[in-house]
Amino acid sequence: MSRAIEVEKITKTYRVKSRRGLFKSSVEFVEAVKGISFTANYGSIVCLLGPNGAGKTTTIKILATLLLPDSGSARVAGYDVVEEASKVRENIGLMLTVEKGFYGKLNGRENLEYFAALYGLPRNIALKRIEHLVKLLELDKLGADRKLYEEFSLGMKARLSLARALLKDAPILLLDEPTLGLDPPSARKIRELVRDMAHRENKSILYTTHNMFEAEIVCDRILLINKGVIVAEGSPEELKDKIPKLKVINLVIKASGDPGKPLERFTFRKEIKQEENSVFNVKMYVPKPEEVLGEIVKALVNSGHEVVNVRVEEPSLEDVFIYYSEGSI
């Protein structure tokens, strides 16, 4: 079987016009995607993981034929996204911003019937498919199949948006931040469904997120993307193994003053966050914590700070992303 998705050196630059004063304006060019390449197989979930503005949504829109790439090529289900756009659209289910495109004066079921008609599904098949999706996504339990869309909660909107993406039962799903802003139960439900669809129904799923935890538990393979460039790829464990063998010293400190001051002489990367009032969380990334931990604690105590808790941990996926996006940790 051919690859579900094949992307080869695609680029996309936006022309952004900004006004300067009453009569003057200037034009800037923003490179959203800078020659990225990757593939995705059927039966797996590939995650584009990166911060806002990294190029995730632009990539999804190119693969969905909503944007043309400036250069490079991409094939979805074996079809070229530029030359065979209609064939691409037949083979994908797309979920973008959860609130886009639905009709407020229709209920959930009526919205799905409307989109099924737009997609050209025969009515008898559409009604059976909608009934299946209403139960699968528990829209009936939430009353979302009967309530007007304008009365939906964000979680109900997300489930309906996913149902719309699944209407055609397409072999390839493009899901752009599907759990963004959702409460934990709704987010968990969507993550479980996504994994089930990939592994039981052999669908290929391209899933974007900026949530490290979500990427680690949902995705089979992760593409770390930053400023339009894929900086690393692999399974969560493979990515962790690629960075230098560092450990994380995690300290909780009750501080009397600036806790960073006594740590200045230690040249390791440090992250200091104030949790509440005088309580700080300090992370230090070191190759051999057993050689420096005593000195670190001593420096803090001698400066009048109370060390409440100390843990030595393996690097997280977040640490991996920091390493690849900033060059080192």
Language-model segments: which ranges?
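An acidic, carboxylate-rich microenvironment
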Residues: 83, 87, 110, 125, ...
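Short, charged/small-residue-rich alpha-helical element at the C-terminal edge
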Residues: 248-320, 324, 329
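ABC transporter nucleotide-binding domains
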Residues: 13-226, 232
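Residue-level marker of the N-terminal boundary of ABC ATPase nucleotide-binding domains
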Residues: 2-4, 30
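ABC transporter nucleotide-binding domain
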Residues: 193-285
